[in-house]
Every structure is written in C-alpha cells, then in structure tokens.
C-alpha cells in the first residue's frame, strides 16, 4: 500500500538541494504526520478519490501536488520502519474518512529521512500527481452527482458552494 501526502510546489519543486522550507512542510502534531491510504496507485479512480478527500479537508479550492509514499521503500533505503497512528480523516468526504492515517515521526532524523525521500521521489513524475483547481471542482461536482459527497457537508462553505455553482453552469444543475 502507498500513502499520499499533499506537498506544495514552492516547498519542493525546482530545488537541487533539500532545504528547511521543504522539511518544515512536514510539520507534525504530537509526532504524527497526516497521510492518506492509496490501495492501488495504478488505478486513477482510487488516486483521485484520495485527492478529493484531501481537497475536502481544505477551506478553499486550490491546486496541490500529492506525492505517493511507500513505507517499504523507506524501510529499505533508510532502515526506518514507519510506525502508524490510525485516525479518521478530517474530510467532508465521509466515505473516505477511514482511508486516513498518520505516520509517526518521533525524531528529526525520521523527518529528515522522509524529506530526503520525497525530494528524490519527485524527480520522477510517476511518483506524484498534480491537481489544478478546475479538476478538483469537477471531481467534487461528480462526487455530489454520484452521491459520494453530500451537499449538507459542503453547502455552508462559500468557496466550495461557489465551485459547485461554477460547475453547474458548465455541466448542468445537480438539483441540490
């Protein structure tokens, strides 16, 4: 199984050397770093569901990158057995809440290993996905239409409400 983590363009891409900005993006709370389970990274539908769950943790619709992490590869490269702290995701995509967990990073060494690992992974575009705002808007529209995301969970958030309205103008009313 792989695990997805949101990363920023400014924090990671276009840098020859790993720097403090990249490392600081892997900040923890109680030594735990939020990640999402990806059961089949070759299945774009599965990966997109994780991306939508991650997007629906945010208060606004915005682009992001999502890197795919392999704990077995981390173990092999760094002799670090990643520990997990299960926790439901704080997402409005209720069906995906259980697909969230945390990596436990007890030391700066572990944070550093993970940072170096991500820095190396993103050299290959197959190890990350990019989602622009319009793709995310369309994904949430489709999820609402399919009944995977409930209108009640997002209707009071102005940014998401506006995004759905934009998609309805293009793809038709959802009659919510």
Regions found by a protein language model. Name each.
Residues 26-31, 40-176:
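Conserved NAD+-utilizing ADP-ribose enzyme module
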Residues 37:
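Short HxH-centered metal-ligating active-site micro-motif
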Residues 1-34, 47:
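ADP-ribose/NAD+-binding catalytic cleft of ART/PARP-like enzymes
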